[in-house]
Amino acid sequence: MDYKKSEAKEYAREHLVGVWAANLTPFDDDLRIDEKAYRENLDHWIKDLQLGGLFIAGKQAEFFSMSIPERKRLMEMSVEAAQAAGDRGGIGRCGIITSCSDTNLDVVLELAQHSQNIGADYVIVHSPVLHFGADTDETIYEYYRHLSDKLDIGLAMWNHPDCGYTMSPELCARIAELPNVVAIKYSTDRANYKRLTEMVGDKIHVSNPDEHDWLDNIIELGWKLYLCSTPPFLLQTKVDQRMNEYTRLAFAGKHDEARKVHDSLEPVRQALRDSRPKGKPQAHGKAWQDLLGQHGGKVRRPLLNLTEAELEATRQAFNSSGLRLA
């Protein structure tokens, strides 16, 4: 860590910015983590795409089907790659935020302490999956307060539909007062995240993984962080970086130019969206990666791989998307 616990909020306001992507995990034929393939993906994301940061070992990465040592290994390789790349010719080091979410609090703390020890920049933990509805707000607040007490590293909240509930902006704002809470990935509707931005946008980063709305959120809400999903490396190539481009233009106040670039990506978005089978985002993302020349591969159970028909539909959509490969 390059900051003290008391400095976490200030540090994140300056450094937890830009376009961040959530990794997919390549497995070999025996469904073990393919470390060579993953390192090559990391090099592409960090050096070719020059992403602001990477979100490691989350849902897209299939953390739920990994052992604790495997999750730690993903984190270690990611931190090593970011550190080895350095400041990338002056644009700054690629940040690393590790997803330490689990239903077991001891596992969450073990992964978060490991992240802190190996040099990750931040950790993110999704709100607990609750099986009973009584005193939900107090339960969630105490969960994050306990994590904040136990950790020095910057901590991001994460609330999504899989948790079974939506945290209210008021609850999120209360948690945002904790000393090392620095951000929230708020996978909810715009009314909620707009309200939360109005409440605490000067204290923590508020973000949402919908890439289509990212430009509007920069312009209208003053957002500085896309946190995050797979679009930064599925919608972009080494020679076609329109998401990065419209982000830079918008940050520079060139909103009309940014809008033109943003809108030009719609055929790619549509191809990616329309060819994605319901319930198979990881398998589809990996198939798209393979078409891009990245390392995708298979998914682990309980997830299902694409059928041959779904693969063919994905190939056709990819070929018609207009995404430039060279």
Mark where each language-model region is.
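Active-site beta->alpha loop and helix N-cap motifs at the rims of alpha/beta catalytic domains
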Residues: 2-164, 302-305, 324
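Short secondary-structure transition/capping segments
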Residues: 66-67, 109, 135-138, 168-169, ...
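Catalytic alpha/beta core domains of metabolic enzymes, predominantly
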Residues: 146-149, 161-269, 273-277
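Conserved, mostly hydrophobic/aromatic
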Residues: 31, 45, 78, 115, ...
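C-terminal alpha-helical cap/extension of soluble enzyme domains
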Residues: 2-9, 18-25, 44-51, 222-223, ...
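A general structural signal for well-ordered alpha-helical segments in protein cores
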Residues: 38, 75, 108, 193, ...
